UniProtKB/Swiss-Prot annotation:
Domain notes: The IMP cyclohydrolase activity resides in the N-terminal region.
InterPro entries reported for this sequence: AICAR_Tfase_dup_dom_sf, Cytidine_deaminase-like, MGS-like_dom, MGS-like_dom_sf, PurH-like
A Gene Ontology BP annotation from the UniProt entry: 'de novo' IMP biosynthetic process
Gene name of the encoded protein: purH
Protein EC: 2.1.2.3, 3.5.4.10
Catalysed reactions, semicolon-separated: (6R)-10-formyltetrahydrofolate + 5-amino-1-(5-phospho-beta-D-ribosyl)imidazole-4-carboxamide = 5-formamido-1-(5-phospho-D-ribosyl)imidazole-4-carboxamide + (6S)-5,6,7,8-tetrahydrofolate; IMP + H2O = 5-formamido-1-(5-phospho-D-ribosyl)imidazole-4-carboxamide
Keyword field contains Ribosomal protein: no
Pfam families (alphabetical): AICARFT_IMPCHas, MGS
The species this protein was found in: Yersinia enterocolitica serotype O:8 / biotype 1B (strain NCTC 13174 / 8081)
Descriptive protein name: Bifunctional purine biosynthesis protein PurH
NCBIfam families: PRK00881.1, purH
Amino acid sequence: MQQRRPIRRALLSVSDKAGIIEFATALSQRGIELLSTGGTARLLADAGLPVTEVSDYTGFPEMMDGRVKTLHPKVHGGILGRRGQDDGIMAQHDIQPIDIVVVNLYPFAQTVARPDCSLEDAVENIDIGGPTMVRSAAKNHKDVAIVVKSSDYPAIIAELDENDGSLTYPTRFNLAIKAFEHTAAYDSMIANYFGALVPAYHGDTEQPSGRFPRTLNLNYIKKQDMRYGENSHQQAAFYIEEDVKEASVATALQLQGKALSYNNIADTDAALECVKEFSEPACVIVKHANPCGVAIADSLLAAYDKAYKTDPTSAFGGIIAFNRELDAETASAIISRQFVEVIIAPSVSTEALALLAAKQNVRVLTCGQWQERSAGLDFKRVNGGLLVQDRDLGMVTEADLRVVSQRQPTEQELRDALFCWKVAKFVKSNAIVYARDNMTIGIGAGQMSRVYSAKIAGIKAADEGLEVAGSAMASDAFFPFRDGIDAAAAVGITCVIQPGGSIRDDEVIAAADEHGIAMIFTDMRHFRH
């Protein structure tokens, strides 16, 4: 259906005024009558545009501090009236058709994000008339266009010019979908906010009393369909949050290479989030969502060389993340040394990109620089439900550590311990990481017993000819028995960092003392499943 509808009358009422003067000017220049409300009407009038206040159009004033202004039959009749079917009743009541509605809603999300937001503030930023107009126009998209995003303004003007002042049905239908998505997201935010107040339990509704609402409403936007999911028999798509502020795989720009696969995205996320932990030039190589090599150094090339040496076998076909601009020297080393699926960095130099162009199958992403890790929620789907928790942003510094062994760690052991502790946070549990001189020596991931993760880390190091003696070992959770310490001592580990908290901590500490190992407690666990 390509049926066009001429646009002769527009109703504009926006909280976000970005681009509205330019858009309204373009509409007016094309002979379209402008109706508007409150602050939007004043803004347009001040810009010299011919605009009719809705209260003048309806003959009914705004009241109750603006709570009631567009809830009137002349407004909604003009929007909902079916052309060719309701013309008679519209004429009888002097209702003029409204052909395009331009509305965005009160800034509820921004309001409740303020630390000083009260319940009264939140309530006053719940839009009533706006969503009603949006839904009315979207319902009647056969005859009316609804615009909720300023990013659509240029395309609408261009189409009006291409179609003699009309908009096509596909455009109106697409705009209606955006409108329903917009109101659904808006109502979800309100429901989530009120659901977190839980007044029945706390008796204080001035501030949210819980992190998690009674009903969880989520809104994500589809970024791409995927060829398949984790396996080829599974269909899949990638959805992203609407306004992601933090540098992430969701917001990254792909400079070259094939479309990202489901597994590419999952692994790239794991690599990028791990490399964000480090302030020094760092490289993280990931395979199947587990780091297989991590290092920091004075240069990106040195960091990559060290990370690669941890486990060259696993690095084949892996994902590489950096926390600095990718330079030509490092790019050259990568493509001459290994097959890589994805490279992600804050930026890529022109020279590096020219070198990578010789390997067009390599997916190259830039994510921009990051400042701080944003708080958010993690989700895990279970059959029939969803587990929700805060993101694991827990960190420890040297000041947080407790040395529980007889021997104190050396300065180098302490640096290595803090380094491998950061890595262990991103290794699947049970996680054991060996590190020395700011590089991983061996990584044991995902084993059902902690001692076997420790043994695997030692085997990995031995296979690559890496010297374990004098290395630090990190464990993402406490050691339930001394066997993990005995295994570490057997390969030359001299410092262990772990959360502590086992009922057998005394036995584990005693084992460390027997072997002359310095043991550090963090009092923070980092399970990752």
